[in-house]
């Protein structure tokens, strides 16, 4: 009764193509190119166009996200976290708790399976535990249930792509263009790095003399997607 909440419904965007049309981007688009695709199309005997779509993927690590924070002397805090990036936990905890990094100790006894899902995504739960410890001066543990973990954490990035590919009479690839629409979710997380890896892997194992690839990291109303084995490479090669 002491808190009054006013909620206004806003448009929900979950399709990266729709987000791109409305300029809802995590950061500016990137384009990689080689040769001259515009000139190459005229020399191609066969040209194909189409779309490709790849969905997200749950990490399903053996143990869910979790952290345990304990108060030490002189305002120091020790965080036991299932993170793949202990320095990120230390740096973020110091910023949120407004203390020096030297006052935050991060231990990683075991991860319990990660596959990329406990890089940046492990940090919020560790910070919640640390903040509770700072306020209460008592040990605090935060462990997600499997259902909450699957609902609240990011997955492999879904992609939607437009492609155009041209072949010579001998069926050698002469030119290739593609536009990637990455579904980043609501915040950046590792989406910029994942997107650039997609561009680096866009031609798979082939040498194509004329290439142009553009990628958009699209902001949608979903949990921020994150690293997963391959880190954007599989989406680019697909």
Model-identified regions with their sequence ranges:
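Structural alpha/beta core scaffold segments of enzyme domains
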Residues: 1-238
